[in-house]
Amino acid sequence: MLIFEHSRPGRRNYSQSPKAAEATDIPEKLLRKTLPLLPEVSEMDAVRHYTRLSQKNFSIDTHFYPLGSCTMKYNPRACNSLAMLPQFLARHPRSPESTGQGFLACMYELQEILKDVTGMAGVSLTPMAGAQGELIGIAMIRAYHESRGDTARTEIIVPDAAHGTNPATAVMCGYKVVEIATDKEGNVDMAALKAAVGPKTAGLMLTNPSTLGVFEENVAEMSRIVHQAGGLLYYDGANLNAILGKVKPGDMGFDVIHINLHKTFSTPHGGGGPGSAPVGVAPRLLPFMPVPIVAFENGTYRWQTEKDIPQSIGRLSAHMGNAGVLLRAYVYVRLLGAEGMHRVAEFAALNANYLMAELRKAGFEIAYPNRRASHEFIVTLKDLKEKTGVTAMNLAKRLLDKGYHAPTTYFPLLVPECLLIEPAETESKETLDAFVTAMKEILEETRTQPDLVKSAPHTTPVRRLDDVKAARELDLAWKAPTRNITRTETLTPIPTVSVA
């Protein structure tokens, strides 16, 4: 049930601590003429409702979450605690620089750390989501070409295994997308790349390791080809976790990168957000970076603005990005240190390769059996579907009954009936072994009880949804009652407490 379905007129009982002063000085013109259509429930009913919902949540705090290309790692509670210190929370974004030196120091150090681990010449912390970071990266590439009068470059090259945001970003920046194929080993087809590159090439967008879970073996040659043609290289930082502290995108030849803090640097995902995706640039793109950026000059931290970077592509937010998320990432990298970041990549690769080997032994088909998993890998159920009729979606739904979140399904699109599995570095061997056991059980069920798997899930609060009906008959908002309640109507009195 929705909270609105618990609502009863006049039931607005709640406890409230005494206030120092009533807000009686609000101008009449700013007051609502009708009361907001909020649910009217008792405090106890509200607490019970949301507690029940929280108990139905499936999250990284409750279960193993091997969602490929998402890096669902544990978020250390120390990061939350320190980022929520009163000194940070009470600071106004527009407070004078002189009163925010501690915060600015944290942001400056985060910029410097991200520069170091990515091999970039400069970093801006302002983008507020991965997709926005992508957009800014391609916008800087466009600004670079336009500053040189090189307006004939109208194409962005994108591999067929790329995230869907890559071509969308290129189109939003006014470019034509040129898709190139992947070879049988999961690498970008070099012949296709050479054929696609030319005087119209503005750049190449690449994720490395790719969404196929393998490292691009020819990345240095790809960089040479694109740069020789006058284009630039964009690095989608979605899978940076796999190479953190081991390989720097700047050393591979990339000119611009965005970093998903909710993946590599363990800030909360989704509803635990908001997001943040700093961008890093090579020297040639420094003049176009979004502002503000923190500078350290003469022993003082300060904001660099459009006055300092006149060719900047501009601002992305009212202030400087999602400060609370950036603080969490800063605490995370300080907790890890350089050695800890090395271990992140090592254990991400170790867990992925161990899990891949165990599932292969269990009878699952690996999409790229000759390649080492970088941090994730793909299982294809193409043959299983032909033999039993069980699809990747069926198996994913059945995993929910076993207490595991499903891996990413049907992505990348070029691998049929695929599961993209990423265990992340924070999972224990015992957790991975238990997951393998569950996968073995489901594999046996596909042979002995295929209908059980096809009709899953059976134990979740919500069963299988009608995807077609949901898409065609949208029901996205609560339909409020038509009666308006005016401010002059008699309301149920709320008890007050006098304090001596």
UniProtKB/Swiss-Prot annotation:
Cofactor(s) recorded for this entry are: pyridoxal 5'-phosphate
Assigned keywords, A-Z: Oxidoreductase, Pyridoxal phosphate
Question: GO molecular function: any one?
Answer: glycine binding
Q: What does this protein do?
A: The glycine cleavage system catalyzes the degradation of glycine. The P protein binds the alpha-amino group of glycine through its pyridoxal phosphate cofactor; CO(2) is released and the remaining methylamine moiety is then transferred to the lipoamide cofactor of the H protein.
Q: Which gene encodes it?
A: gcvPB
Summarize the subunit comment: The glycine cleavage system is composed of four proteins: P, T, L and H. In this organism, the P 'protein' is a heterodimer of two subunits.
Q: Which GO terms describe its cellular component?
A: cytosol; glycine cleavage complex
Renumbered residue ranges of the record's region Disordered: 1-25
Know the name of this protein?
Probable glycine dehydrogenase (decarboxylating) subunit 2
List the EC numbers from the record.
Answer: 1.4.4.2
**PANTHER family per the UniProt record, alphabetical:** GLYCINE DEHYDROGENASE (DECARBOXYLATING), MITOCHONDRIAL (PTHR11773:SF1), GLYCINE DEHYDROGENASE, DECARBOXYLATING (PTHR11773)
A Pfam family cross-referenced in the UniProt record is GcvP2_C
Q: Which InterPro entries match?
A: Aminotrans_V_dom (IPR000192), GcvPB (IPR023012), GDC-P_C (IPR049316), GDC_P (IPR020581), PyrdxlP-dep_Trfase (IPR015424), PyrdxlP-dep_Trfase_major (IPR015421), PyrdxlP-dep_Trfase_small (IPR015422)
Catalytic reactions on record: N(6)-[(R)-lipoyl]-L-lysyl-[glycine-cleavage complex H protein] + glycine + H(+) = N(6)-[(R)-S(8)-aminomethyldihydrolipoyl]-L-lysyl-[glycine-cleavage complex H protein] + CO2
Q: Does the keyword Cell inner membrane apply?
A: no
Q: Which family does it belong to?
A: Belongs to the GcvP family. C-terminal subunit subfamily.
Query: Which SUPFAM superfamilies does the record associate with it?
Result: PLP-dependent transferases
